From Swiss-Prot:
GO MF term list: DNA binding; structural constituent of chromatin
InterPro entries linked to this entry: Hist_DNA-bd, Histone-like_DNA-bd_CS, IHF-like_DNA-bd_dom_sf, IHF_beta
Name of the gene encoding the protein in the UniProt record: ihfB
SUPFAM superfamilies: IHF-like DNA-binding proteins
Function summary: This protein is one of the two subunits of integration host factor, a specific DNA-binding protein that functions in genetic recombination as well as in transcriptional and translational control.
Gene3D superfamilies, A to Z: IHF-like DNA-binding proteins
Superkingdom assignment: Bacteria
Annotated protein name in UniProt: Integration host factor subunit beta
Species assigned in the record: Haemophilus ducreyi (strain 35000HP / ATCC 700724)
Quaternary data: Heterodimer of an alpha and a beta chain.
């Protein structure tokens, strides 16, 4: 599901809400998650999961086109860990 599809589904489930309000709400939630991660803080949504940053060590990679070694710097990457409720609901599928 894309962000656009999520917005369309929420609009269909809540016809009394203005489309712009739903769209702004989804965008605001995602923006706040990103801003919190930029500050190296963790975002926890109980039952759903948590977003955090994981550190990746510097390493030597390979250019897939040429096969040449490339030095990759250390970096932080976003990480999502599913919560208990989400894991249980997905396991039923």
């Amino acid at each position: 599901m894309t962000k656009s599809e999520l917005i369309e589904k929420l609009i269909a489930l809540n016809p009394s809400l203005p489309e712009k309000a739903v769209e702004d709400g989804v965008k605001d939630i995602l923006e706040n998650i990103m801003l919190t991660l930029e500050q190296a803080k963790r975002v926890e949504i109980r039952g759903f999961g948590s977003f955090s940053l994981h550190y990746r060590q510097p390493r030597i990679g390979r250019n897939p086109k040429t096969g040449a070694s490339v030095k990759l710097d250390a970096k932080y990457v976003p990480h999502f860990k599913a919560g208990k409720d989400l894991k249980e609901r997905v396991d039923l599928v």
